[in-house]
Amino acid sequence: MLACVCLNPSFDRTVSLRSFTVGDVNRVLSARQDVGGKGINVAITARRLGIASCVLGCAGKNGIDAVRRKLDGEQVTHVFLPVDGDVRTNMKIVPQDGTGVTELNEPGAPVNAANQRAFSDLLAEKTVAGQYVVLTGSLPPECPPEYYRDLMLSLPERLFVLDVSGAALMAGLAARPFLVKPNRSELQAAMNRPLPTMADVHQAALELLEMGAQNVLVSLGGEGALWVSERGAMFAPAIPVRVQSTVGAGDAMVGGVMAGLEKTGDVRHALAYGAAAGCASVMTEGTQLIRPDDFAALLPQVQIQDV
């Protein structure tokens, strides 16, 4: 079973407009709300692709029942530690004129030191040696950037996948995660330099290996995805599809990769699964997750290239 950690779940509200003007009244064309959080998105994606998944996390007492109902409906098992506060609401403003998505993200309910210790115990209890465990998403208030690193160091027999950015990513590399998955922007921030070419991205991924990562998957949006390890590198070009929304595409890619690893144990197949899932994700509106039929149609079109 795939385990996904979600310490900061959310209600993701997506509004669509013809255009968005700061400082003016903007008329909404449509709106929808989904239960979100990167760990939740990864788990649901993997489950829709046939992989048994569970979510382990913390959630504000106000709203936790709605999160649980969503996961029950997706047949994803879950254990949440209730904490004081509300499940946060994130707003995604999507103009139809192509000017880009604006996101307004609340910080979430604080997870204090006692909660952190309790969750560490929960993760040890609910996972086993050799199991894939995905650590992803923003850390809630009061959680230090080293928290993911400390979880990994406390359970070295697990196969951790780290999909975070900034200080949490840099700290986490010391625990030698099985896989890290930055996008280009996150990788540029980690390297503190621009990475305009594929060669630049490849070199930066190699540097992450030197810092501790065992495998690096860089998601490159409409270009595709690059997998780098000590054994070599592979590139999966993006499949041309009609893009409805790019929100959650990175989570879908991670969910697809994990489904591929769980089913085959082969990183080449896992990259193909991730590429197909990421492309399937952008075919859905707002924060909706992938449709299995879209994934099944796209998977045979993925062409993995050795780099």
Residues covered by each model-derived region:
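Short beta-strand scaffold segments in enzyme catalytic cores
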Residues: 44, 91-93, 224-228
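Glycine-rich phosphate/adenosyl-contacting loop at the front of the ribokinase-like
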Residues: 1-56, 64-66
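Conserved phosphate-binding/catalytic region of the ribokinase-like
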Residues: 171, 198-307
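General beta-strand structural signal in soluble alpha/beta enzymes
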Residues: 4-7, 57, 80, 134-135, ...
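Short acidic, glycine-rich surface-loop motifs adjacent to enzyme active sites
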Residues: 130-140
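Short, conserved phosphate/pyrophosphate- and ester-handling motifs at nucleotide-, phospho-/glycolipid
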Residues: 46, 183, 250
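Conserved N-terminal subdomain of the carbohydrate kinase-like
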Residues: 24, 48-131, 297-307
